[in-house]
Swiss-Prot record:
GO CC entries: periplasmic space
Localisation: Periplasm
Function: Probably part of the binding-protein-dependent transport system y4mIJK. This system probably transports a sugar.
Name listed for the protein in its UniProt record: Probable ABC transporter periplasmic-binding protein y4mI
Organism: Sinorhizobium fredii (strain NBRC 101917 / NGR234)
Length: 324
């Protein structure tokens, strides 16, 4: 009887230890919040896919918020996330200029934060990591490519459909492009900034640009929808191929346009990859592992003749989810 009692006690003790271990494991499980500026834009959905994918791989829980392109909503989201007990944040900010109060608050709460796609306002240092494209070098490379497209078509005047210039990534793109235009002998005759990042807006702006400057020979698209909108305008005007287009970011839509030679080049930005890498950096901060503060990912140029290569496919796997 005593042996049976001892056996039962051992079993009970084992069960209790297992339960305690389970509770301890649950308590150790971390949560990462993804704050998107807007989830109406595919790019930010894809960053979120990367955050969620990496969180699952690391054993973290995932929650997401959208800031609806409002700095006030962005701040509310950060406070809500902290109140709900998240351990870390990955953010695509509404703008770089909106980040100082956000960073001050998260520092006061000891919450690690990684930026994805858009970095903090220049001069800010109280962040864990910033995972962006190498926007300046990409701006130079894309500027040179666009200038070459213009010259191939008999001119040197180019137009630009730009991201909002209150974003540090857009400022770096523009600086690089302007340097390339000056070095290569092209003139940027007009730049129009997007507000909504929609194809319809890009169509309107491209139409306005070509009406004001019919001698434009190439268009620099700083974001994916700009390339789609510009291609639509050229098709409507019967100018496909006669005016060159290069675009940054990349999507199934612009890949199809590239294959159809409606655009001539895509500088791919790794949206999924930025989400993955940003999540890893905040996880490293939580676990006292080494952190890389500033990661500037290369944006490789892919042209129609290279789109089906193994190298291009490896890049595209970090741009948007496989289901797309």
């Amino acid at each position: 009887m005593r042996k049976k009692l001892n056996g039962w006690l051992a079993m009970a003790a084992g069960a209790a230890l297992a339960a305690l271990s389970s509770v301890s494991h649950a308590e150790d499980r971390k949560t990462v919040a993804y704050l998107a500026p807007s989830l109406d834009i595919s790019y930010w959905q894809w960053v979120g896919f990367g955050v969620k994918q990496k969180a699952q791989e690391l054993g973290m829980d995932y929650v997401e918020f959208t800031s609806e392109n409002s700095p006030a909503k962005q701040m509310d989201n950060a406070r809500t996330a902290v109140t709900k007990g998240v351990d870390a944040i990955v953010i695509g900010p509404v703008s770089s200029t909106s980040t100082p109060p956000l960073l001050a608050y998260l520092k006061s709460q000891n919450i690690p934060i990684a930026f994805a796609g858009i970095g903090p306002q220049p001069g800010q240092t109280d962040y864990t990591s910033s995972v962006t494209a190498n926007n300046y070098e990409t701006g130079k490379a894309q500027g040179s490519f666009v200038c070459a497209l213009a010259k191939e078509r008999g001119g040197n005047k180019v137009g630009m459909l730009s991201l909002p210039q209150d974003r540090e990534n857009a400022q770096k793109y523009l600086k690089g492009a302007q340097e390339a235009f000056a070095a290569d002998g092209c003139e940027l005759v007009q730049m129009l900034e997007t507000r909504g990042l929609t194809v319809n807006e890009a169509v309107t702006q491209a139409n306005d640009m070509l009406t004001a400057h019919p001698d434009i020979k190439a268009i620099y698209g700083m974001y994916d929808e700009a390339g789609t909108g510009a291609a639509k305008v050229l098709e409507t005007r019967g100018l496909t191929g006669k005016i060159g287009i290069a675009v940054a970011d990349g999507s199934p839509t612009t890949i199809a346009l590239l294959k159809a030679t409606a655009i001539q080049g895509i500088f791919f930005q790794e949206a999924v990859g930025q989400g993955i890498d940003g999540t890893l950096q905040v996880f490293n901060a939580l676990t006292n592992a080494p952190v890389e503060k500033d990661l500037a990912l290369v944006m490789p140029l892919v042209t129609a003749d290279k789109i089906d290569t193994a190298e291009a496919k490896a890049v595209i796997a970090r741009v948007f989810p496989p289901s797309n």
